[in-house]
Amino acid sequence: MKLFIALVGLLALAKALPAVTHSKVLCYYDSRSYVRESQARMLPLDLDPALSFCTHLLYGYAVIQPDTYKLVSLNENLDIDRTHDNYRAITSLKAKYPGLTVLLSVGGDADTEEPEKYNLLLESQQARTAFINSGVLLAEQYGFDGIDLAWQFPRVKPKKIRSTWGSLWHGIKKTFGTTPVDEKESEHREGFTALVRELKQALIHKPKMQLGVTVLPNVNSTIYHDVPAIINLVDYVNVGAYDYYTPTRNNKEADYTAPIYTPQNRNPLQNADAAVTYWLTSGAPSQKIVLSXRLRSYLETGXDSEIAGVPPIHTDGPGEAGPYVKTEGLLSYPEVCGKLINPNQQKGMRPHLRKVTDPSKRFGTYAFRLPDDNGEGGIWVSYEDPDTAGQKAAYVKSKNLGGVAIVDLSLDDFRGLCTGDKYPILRAAKYRL
């Protein structure tokens, strides 16, 4: 009898305590890394050391066929052909990691063919139906646990660096109005809400299938996302609060690409806290919100010598490609760490970069090399490292958010080239949650 009373008491206590929620760690794998060369080439088997830290693995990216609006593989030879069969190679990882949820991610800026089709699809019930039917079939056929909509909406235009006359003309245009980025904003907002609702309806008899939304960077959620209408239909919303400054968007100025809070005298909306706050104040439960850390590092040339690299700085455009990813203006984390000064090198020794951390833990990390006496060789790079990823995870925990996303694993140090530890950025984010 005493045992029964004790059990009843424990049950009552358990009900009184708040439910324990487990933070999500969304790990994106960009399949385009499969065709890179040498140390940058990432195969499905390279994911193994990461998956014990991930709750979700998102395979990117599926794309929209322009003429039919069906969801198809970005690279059928890689994803579906029996030689590689990446789709099945990825979903088969669940056998070793039974708690892992594997989703197929759509768009993600990988779909470069006729990008206007993303808006056109939203305007047509028939197109949405074709997308949904083909998407659900594709996910089921290859064993995915659902779909992530990384929808390619039009982007907010970057700030331009203007001359005096240019600034005057810009002021005149603002006074009399300018052409909006998207002339059918309301229709596309309603269309995306309908897409989410209809896709959720198609999955309603498949209870294990999940549906997520990824907000790509520089997409204006106040325009395209009807938060109250979609938030209860999705398992998470992954907020992409990064890429505010890149060599592509701002080829004459460099700054922190993914600050948590607003640096002084900057756009108050270009930071993680502002992006998250919009969703929370619009009615999203905090546990539905996931914050992204993107591992792309942006390299620019022509750092101003007189300010010792302190951003924002004027630049001459993207820096030269690194030895692994081989993309102008973009570095992976191993390419960054290989350029940094280490204790065995003399301070300031060229061609290495000096790392500058942020003591406030609010803005991010950068590294730089001043120009030489001829004004050449200056470099400035904004990047995510284990410290900044950990700071974002700590922010997520302090706000009781749903988790973090790593975009993407191929740009982490998945070979352990920096210190010998594989996936140091992913690990740091996971440990701080």
Swiss-Prot record:
Glycan-bearing residues: N220
GO process terms (BP): carbohydrate metabolic process; chitin catabolic process
Domain of life (superkingdom): Eukaryota
Subcellular location, principal: secreted
Induction record: Induced 2 to 4 hours after treatment with 20-hydroxyecdysone (20E). Repressed by 8 hours after treatment with 20E, except in the presence of cycloheximide.
One annotated Gene Ontology cellular component of this protein: extracellular region
SMART domains: Glyco_18
Signal peptide: 1-16
Residue intervals of the GH18 domain: 23-433
Key words of the record: Disulfide bond, Glycoprotein, Secreted, Signal
Subcellular location as annotated: Secreted
Cystine pairings recorded for this chain: C27-C54, C337-C418
PROSITE patterns: GH18_2
A molecular function (GO) term: chitinase activity
A Pfam short name: Glyco_hydro_18
PANTHER family for this protein: CHITINASE, CHITINASE-LIKE PROTEIN IDGF1-RELATED
Protein family per UniProt: Belongs to the glycosyl hydrolase 18 family. IDGF subfamily.
Additional remarks: Lacks the typical Glu active site in position 152 that is replaced by a Gln residue, preventing the hydrolase activity. Its precise function remains unclear.
Protein name: Chitinase-like protein EN03
Source organism per UniProt: Bombyx mori (Silk moth)
